[in-house]
Amino acid sequence: MSIGGSLDVGGHIPIPSADALAHSQRLVAMIEASIRAERGGLAFDRFMEAALYAPGLGYYAAGARKFGPEGDFVTAPEIGSLFGQCVGQQVAGIFEELGHGVLLEAGPGTGRLMADVLEALTILGALPDTVLLLETSPELRERQQALLRQRLPDYVARVTWLSEWPSDGFEGVVLANEVLDAMPVKRFRVAAGQPLIAHVIHEASGFGWDWHDADTGSATRLIERYGLPDDYTTEVNERAPAWIRDLGRRLHRGVLLLIDYGFPGNEYYHPDRRDGTLMCHYRHHAHGDPFSYPGLQDITAHVDFSAIAEAGAESGLRVAGFSSQAGFLLSLGLLERAEAMSDAMAAARQVKYLTLPSEMGELFKVMALSRGIKQPLEGFSLSDRTSAL
């Protein structure tokens, strides 16, 4: 997701190049074929999945640069090393109690977070036995490997890349920075107290919405739980809780550290949030049209952290902490680390973007789900909002 200081919200998005438009049209043709095969329209989560992950064509599967100033958005690790240093401090504390274990990152992006964390762990004398990177994109794997070879040449041989979770259970720490928000979501609208599920159809003017009175049960439960009124439109992420439950069964002991933008359930489904949280990003422009340039733009939705906590509990994980990103980083000595930097302006810039409410500090949350960990986690020593879940 883009951060506030470099994000243009609304307005006209840039026009892609001819080659990029041709690429998008190939994906559009594939999605049109899927819509014709369905006859009644394509469920929105399947449209979103194709737009993001269709092999060779989807946004995350096509190889174009996504991260940083030349991409579509900036993530916290790309701002500078302070974020990864603080995360490394927390990881070291967990390994101190575990005594051994695996460090696994899901969706490592450019590899910057893992590189910063490993450098911090080197200084702290807390390098793990094994490092695993769960990455399905061949292009991103290459970028991660190149970065780690450059920054940790003596350690990279101990890093293994995976395309799926380890088959056996394990102990250790799992990092997931901006992973859940990229999972396809179902979109629904409330009518006469019941959910209408969003489908995508193709008309002469392009893709459009169609609404079906079918439900898997999750939307109905949300309507009942939060008293959602008629004409309320929002999303439900059914895949993120399933992802948490699957990981929870494999993590025999340790901590899952989730960093993402979102809210507790009662804030996510607040009566005033009547159009949900669906957001698209293209060349640092944010807008709400998921049908614009399929395959060229990111499509995201915020995280319902109450649902994540409940999914963790179902697989035996407890919430070991829940905080804003600002609270988490400040608990781990962000300001002291910034003061020690030689470049005061760069340090101030990082602190600003990572902690200010108008930037990433408040919208981004950190949740720790743990099993078999007794010591309180340092990252939640200044602020813990678990009771808000």
Feature names for model-found ranges:
Residues A51, V174, I308:
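A residue-level signal for conserved active-site and pocket-lining positions in enzyme catalytic cores
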Residues S2-A106, T110-F170, G327-L330, E336, ...:
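Rossmann-like AdoMet
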Residues Y60, A182-V185, E267, P376-E378:
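Short helix/loop capping segments that flank catalytic or ligand/cofactor-binding pockets
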